[in-house]
């Protein structure tokens, strides 16, 4: 049975279509990584793969709903998982309610190692995207890799 995780919601200071376009191409993830983290990471439009702490992890786009959500699934990973990125419009024009859902089939050992860290990681992703959209770049992030005006 898969473990379910949901990030907190964050209001990103960009419209849903900007976020959708940013995340719909897996090559953008590679471009946003700091140079020292790019070794062993490859990407094309639909897939991204990396070796992290000796584990090979691959991700592929399962489905795209324009300007609303992107569903990702494992591709050659040590466990099965599914990620949904939500880009919901808010009452304020030009803002997005962003959140992430994750379902992962973790064995007992992985659940003990990763279970508590997954929730924190999902929340950090939301916080970082909110910060970037408001011009506060996390260390190691190159603002030139984002669409024009994204981090301003």
Segments and roles (model prediction):
Residues 3-9, 47, 56, 69, ...:
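Intrinsic-disorder/low-complexity, polar/charged segments enriched in Ser/Thr/Lys/Arg/Asp/Glu/Gln
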Residues 9-13, 60, 86:
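Generic structural detector for well-ordered beta-strands
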Residues 19-23, 29, 48, 61, ...:
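Hydrophobic pocket/interface hotspot
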Residues 1-42, 152:
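Hydrophobic ligand-binding cavity/cleft-lining segments
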Residues 26-32, 121-128, 132, 136:
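Conserved short hydrophobic interaction patches
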Residues 30-33, 37-78, 150-151:
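Glycine-rich portal/gate segments that line the openings of hydrophobic small-molecule binding cavities
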Residues 127-152:
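Short, highly charged C-terminal tails/helix-capping segments
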Residues 76-127, 131:
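Beta-strand/loop substructures that line and gate deep hydrophobic ligand-binding cavities in soluble
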């Amino acid at each position: 049975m898969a473990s379910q995780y949901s990030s907190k919601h964050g209001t990103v200071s960009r419209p849903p279509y900007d976020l959708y376009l940013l995340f719909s191409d897996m090559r953008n993830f590679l471009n946003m990584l700091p140079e020292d983290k790019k070794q062993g990471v490859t990407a094309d439009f639909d897939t991204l793969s990396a070796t992290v702490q000796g584990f090979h992890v691959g991700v592929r786009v399962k489905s795209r709903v324009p300007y609303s959500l992107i569903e990702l699934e494992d591709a050659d990973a040590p466990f099965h998982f599914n990620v949904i990125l939500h880009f919901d419009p808010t009452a304020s024009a030009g803002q997005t309610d962003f959140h992430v859902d994750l379902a992962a089939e973790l064995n007992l050992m992985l659940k003990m190692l990763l279970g508590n860290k997954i929730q924190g990681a999902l929340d950090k992703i939301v916080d970082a995207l909110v910060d970037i959209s408001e011009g506060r770049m996390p260390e190691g992030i190159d603002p030139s890799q984002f669409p024009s005006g994204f981090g301003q």
